[in-house]
Amino acid sequence: VLRPLVPALLLVAVSHAAASQALPESQALPEAPACRALFADGRAPTLTNPKLADRAVPLCFEAFAVLHSGVSRTPLYAAERLTRRSVSAARRVERADAFHDEDRLPEDDRASLADYLRSGYDRGHLAPAGDMPSAVAQAESFSLANIVPQNRAVNRGLWAAIEESVRRLASERGEIFVVTGPIFEGRSVGAIKGRVLVPTQMFKAIYDPRTGEAGAYLVPNAAGAEWRAVSLATLRETAGLDVFPALPEASKAKAMALPEPQEFSRGGPESFADFLKQLAVDVLRRLWSELMRAIF
């Protein structure tokens, strides 16, 4: 059930005027020290819209970091460092969906499983389960602190293809930093169950530390959505967030050539080998499970 946004929650909507400069140091949000390795040059994304800072809480997980908003009851971003090795490890982890509430957050400031029940929206990951290099990391990715209400067609189609394309890019280049987040823009922002804000758009920003290139995918959170590439400077104005604050303005002014979103490709030897390995692992696990059930 999608309900109109109550006026108080409009505080989270991005204002282009408010996004013109970073928060002063006195308003800077604390960083989780253990998560600094997940940020480009060890610096967390910076909120440039002060309205987004209200009831914002940073959380550190094994393979990603989030900044969670008690106003929207969603994450404002999830940050990751993807490498060739981590992507290869992630392909060997069997997916086990187990969405759960995030107990580290105040109950009134977080989403619950009940909020998403019969909402008409998918529980969309910011840091994808498919990026997680271990079973523990994958389980953590199903925390609702890493989830936003996402259009089903987008989540299962275009967005899934973007996630896979980013993993392939990490495999090709060796290391990239990724920041993913929602955008709440305009006066038509809605909320499921009157509690959890529904993004109007989604972004996935990428930075290659070897070449200095950066850019972002921008996708409307609606059926029939098409993606476009934007610079980090454009994203900052739209989202109220400087995703890679350590980068020079010259790198933020131009969008890198982003790979065309596509699902898992068997076109290259490396990706085909990974596919065959994962297929073999999945088949063996199913056979083992069936054998155990037959015996016991």
Language-model segment annotations:
Residues 4, 11-296:
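Domain-level detector for secreted/extracellular nuclease and nuclease-toxin modules, and
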